[in-house]
Regions:
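Phosphate- and other anionic-substrate recognition elements at nucleic-acid/protein interfaces
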Residues: 2-6, 10-136
Length: 136
């Protein structure tokens, strides 16, 4: 099954693609659109471009593992995307995914601007890699 992972942000949303056969995950793009109807449309177009079978959306849990207001907002947005695309949406813990993305970029020699742009897509990679590892 092919997945498109989504790391939702207030200003930018990172996307990563991968599958559960070879378990290769790669960053594919960053969408520079604030969350809302315009982002839902941009994600629907990204789904058409990348052709996933399902979506994995990072769920912002509290550090104790509980769900707060941010998680409820992401779940509601996920329901919108599911209705718009007709794809199954899976949610996965995104705690520390941005930290992991920063660690991956720490020694790459990229400029601050390049790192800032790539960070969200690498966070989506971390979310999808963890999801695939957990689901078998």
């Amino acid at each position: 099954m092919r997945y498109l992972a989504i790391d939702l942000g207030a200003k930018r949303t990172g996307l990563a693609a991968g599958d559960d056969v070879v378990r290769l995950v790669q960053p594919v793009e960053v969408i520079d659109v604030p969350r809302g109807p315009a982002l839902a449309e941009a994600l629907a177009r990204a789904v058409e471009r990348h052709g996933p079978d399902a979506l994995v959306i990072g769920l912002p849990l509290n550090m104790d593992g509980s769900e707060g207001a941010a998680a409820a907002e992401v779940r509601a947005f996920g329901a919108t995307i599911a209705a718009r695309t007709g794809l199954a949406v899976h949610f996965h813990d995104e705690r520390l995914s941005s930290f992991e993305a920063d660690q991956r970029m720490a020694r790459t020699g990229r400029t601050h601007r390049e790192k800032k742009q790539l960070r969200d897509a690498l966070a989506a990679c971390a979310i999808l890699e963890a999801y695939l590892a957990e689901t078998g």
